[in-house]
Amino acid sequence: DRLSHAYLFSGPRGTGKTSTAKILAKSLNCINGPTPEPCNVCANCERINNGSSMDVLEIDAASNRGIDEIRELREAVKFAPVDGRYKVYIIDEVHMLSASAFNAFLKTLEEPPHHAIFILATTEKHKILPTILSRCQIYDFNRITVEDTVEHLSYVARQEGVHFEPEALNVIALKADGGMR
């Protein structure tokens, strides 16, 4: 029942790390929450779904890997949430941050404001500083099995009224290499 201030979601591409981060952000900020299952219809959930929430910020570390961006984050984190209970910072591809950016970010992870939650996502956990890892609750995501991928593709096709050959779904699932994208 205790909430961590920092999570690290690690695993291959397409295994749901960023999607899970957004679901967690909705669970924390849903008007009916905090709840294990966000409603997806309240104003907070809708804003998170369409990317317009002032309380959930997604940062692509592959594009914003420098110390200046992390300094901006350190300043922004001081401000309380606008609509929800928490400000959630989702930092995708966090392993791409420069060493100086990691060190600047460490200070924020060591003394986070009570309203800030950090969700770091990576495909390369081994590139993240041990001092960062030690401050995160770590969740390892695994490749999705071919069977589960076929089952999901079949479900989506039926929902959309699309005819399919089961063998074709199996080929697609094999080519997906454990990712659901």
Q: Which residues are covered by each model-predicted region?
A:
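Helix-loop-helix "sensor" segment of P-loop NTPases
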Residues: Y139, V146-N170
